[in-house]
């Protein structure tokens, strides 16, 4: 319970895309990004290096690459708009940078959903020293 309280307090100080990304993951993949993907494999969570360990970790690798292509705003804090139409997430708004961040998050959430069968608990809190291989290019 204490951990949940700490997480809640930390989230209060975070605005924009990271909170929205969590909400998209919950809406699309029906899982908590925080408790399922924040420390998974070599790429899910802060930073990322080495080779993705499985298809789920590869979703995070692609998401990191997508964020790396965002240049006109900070993808971790840019607040964007989206809607749901016929069961699909549609990114909106007039700001192309924020829309790009939304697309990165949308694609990752769909990837997580589509790869739920590949999720392997052995990659949760995967030791970083196991992520030393040369990464593939974005």
From Swiss-Prot:
It catalyses: a 1,2-diacyl-sn-glycero-3-phosphocholine + H2O = a 1-acyl-sn-glycero-3-phosphocholine + a fatty acid + H(+). The active site is at residues 63, 105. Its EC number is 3.1.1.4. SUPFAM superfamilies: Phospholipase A2, PLA2. Disulfide bonds join 42-131, 44-60, 59-111, 65-138, 66-104, 73-97, 91-102. InterPro entries: PLipase_A2 (IPR001211), PLipase_A2_Asp_AS (IPR033112), PLipase_A2_dom (IPR016090), PLipase_A2_dom_sf (IPR036444), PLipase_A2_His_AS (IPR033113). Its main location: secreted. Optimum temperature is 37.3 degrees Celsius. It is an enzyme of class 3 (hydrolase). Expressed by the venom gland. GO terms for biological process: arachidonate secretion; lipid catabolic process; negative regulation of T cell proliferation; phospholipid metabolic process. It is found in: Secreted. GO terms for cellular component: extracellular region. Pfam families: Phospholip_A2_1. Its cofactor is Ca(2+). Residues 1-16 form the signal peptide. Snake venom phospholipase A2 (PLA2) that shows very low inhibition of ADP-induced platelet aggregation in platelet-rich plasma of human, rabbit and guinea pig. Shows edema-inducing activity and myotoxicity. PLA2 catalyzes the calcium-dependent hydrolysis of the 2-acyl groups in 3-sn-phosphoglycerides. Belongs to the phospholipase A2 family. Group II subfamily. D49 sub-subfamily. This is Acidic phospholipase A2 CoaPLA2. The lineage of its organism: Eukaryota, Metazoa, Chordata, Craniata, Vertebrata.
